Design a protein with these regions (language model features):
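Hydrophobic faces of well-ordered beta-strands that scaffold small-molecule active sites
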Residues: 78-84, 100-104, 136-142, 195-199, ...
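Short, acidic/polar
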Residues: 84-96, 176-187, 278-284, 346-355
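Second-shell residues forming the walls of enzyme active-site clefts
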Residues: 113-125, 228-389
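A charged helix-plus-loop insertion that forms the helical arch/lid used to bind
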Residues: 155-170, 219-223
Length: 416
């Protein structure tokens, strides 16, 4: 038994060693916890700095724009059509002449009646008259079918494709489309809307892809037959125009073949120009030449012409094809520059707006994210100051806007 005297010593030694290791581990864990807390604190600080810096930059940009030269605001603002959620804010922009139009959609009816919306529009138009400026463009998306932004309370009509497919004869089709356009024109004019982003003249190519969640042209297109689409668009536009509502042919160069969704990301149209000219572009060209229609430019990249820029701000497409080859002298408006296919490009909405106006576009739409108006306007003001805006293109655009003004829809203001 005398030989086992060392056993307790070994046991105590092992116990002390384990306690030492445990203490060291706790120290390490404490340090790790401290480090993680410090890292989390730094990340939170960085996040807050980013938020406040971004918000501060936005507020500074907004103040700079609103304090800008009124003549410059009016000169550049006539090219911008913006959405809004805060009526007081858009009213301030109209008072300064800083925009050329407004976009009305579902949220503008939330919490108020059609009559209240009607009076808001009348108030904005009265402000324009006080400044001796032309009427605002007051636009909406009322295609019928799944894109009927103001239905209800306005009449919800089926898609034009359904009207066409149910027509027994060409004469019946003509009558039905006339009634359809008459309903849209009459109801929109009653609210004070003078520009409808319809009809869709993209051809139905039957393209259905999982990645296309928002464009879904196959559900909105009139037909796969370009002659039918051209005839229906012509009849529809004429019916609306009788009520003072201008139509919009969309979305050049045609979205029916796309597999991507330009609301979310870039998409390429790889079809040869010769094939597009013989098929997809027939409705655009025919109706553009024979009506008062505006034309909306989509955001796909037409790879045969310009591999770098979406059509909406591609000089090769806008100036090269539409203005030069087609000799089109009507109004061109872009699709929303809040969309991913523009916003996520290297140019962003600001650079894209400068390039669009320099290419020969008349109106740039900023509807979903109305806050983009301020950085876009600030960029335009700087571009003008540094001679980066084409004086020739802007002069031609002002001339077109003067020759094709919004139609004045008289809505009386409420008594004071």
């Amino acid at each position: 038994m005398e030989l086992l005297w060392w056993v307790p010593l070994v046991f105590m030694g092992l116990l002390c060693l384990n306690l030492w290791r445990l203490w060291q581990r706790q120290q390490i864990e404490n340090r790790l916890r401290y480090g993680m807390r410090l890292l989390l604190l730094l990340l939170c600080a960085a996040g807050l700095t980013f938020v406040f810096t971004t918000e501060g930059r936005y507020r500074l940009t907004k103040r700079t724009v609103l304090a800008g030269d009124r003549a410059q605001l009016q000169r550049l603002g006539q090219h911008l059509v913006v959405g809004y959620r805060d009526f007081a804010e858009v009213q301030k922009l109209v008072q300064k002449g800083g925009i050329g139009g407004v976009f009305i959609t579902r949220h503008n009816l939330e919490g108020q009646s059609v009559e209240q919306l009607q009076q808001q529009i009348a108030t904005l138009q009265a402000l324009r008259r006080e400044q001796n400026l032309p009427p605002l463009w007051v636009a909406t998306d009322q295609e019928g079918g799944i894109v009927s932004r103001l239905s209800p309370p306005l009449t919800h009509l089926p898609p034009l494709a359904e009207v066409v497919s149910q027509a027994a004869t060409p004469a019946d089709q003509y009558q039905q489309v006339q009634q359809y356009g008459d309903t849209h024109g009459r109801e929109l004019a009653a609210v004070g809307i003078n520009l409808n982003f319809a009809p869709v003249v993209d051809l139905n190519k039957g393209v259905v892809t999982p990645g296309d969640r928002l464009s879904v042209i196959y559900r909105r297109a009139i037909s796969d037959d370009n002659a039918v689409v051209a005839a229906v668009a012509q009849e529809y536009c004429a019916a609306m125009f009788r009520h003072g509502v201008r139509c919009t042919l969309k979305h050049f160069p045609g979205l029916g073949r796309l597999t991507g969704d330009t609301h979310l990301h870039s998409a390429h149209l790889d079809t040869p120009v010769a094939e597009l000219a013989q098929d997809d572009w027939v409705p655009f060209q025919q109706v553009m030449q024979s009506s008062q229609a505006m034309t909306m430019l989509g955001h796909p990249i037409l790879t045969a012409v310009d591999k770098q820029h979406p059509v909406s701000f591609s000089k090769g497409v806008v100036d090269g094809i539409l203005r030069q080859q087609w000799q089109y002298d009507g109004l061109l408006i872009t699709d929303d520059f809040s969309m991913g296919a523009v916003f996520n490009t290297r140019d962003g909405a600001t650079g894209a707006t400068i390039k669009a106006l320099n290419a020969g576009v008349d109106l740039v739409l900023i509807s979903y994210d109305a806050d983009l108006y301020y950085p876009v306007m600030a960029a335009l003001m700087q571009a003008e100051q540094h001679n980066r805006l084409s004086l020739e293109q802007l002069a031609a655009s002002r001339d077109r806007l003067h020759r094709h003004p919004p139609i004045t829809i008289s809505i009386p203001l409420p008594p004071p």
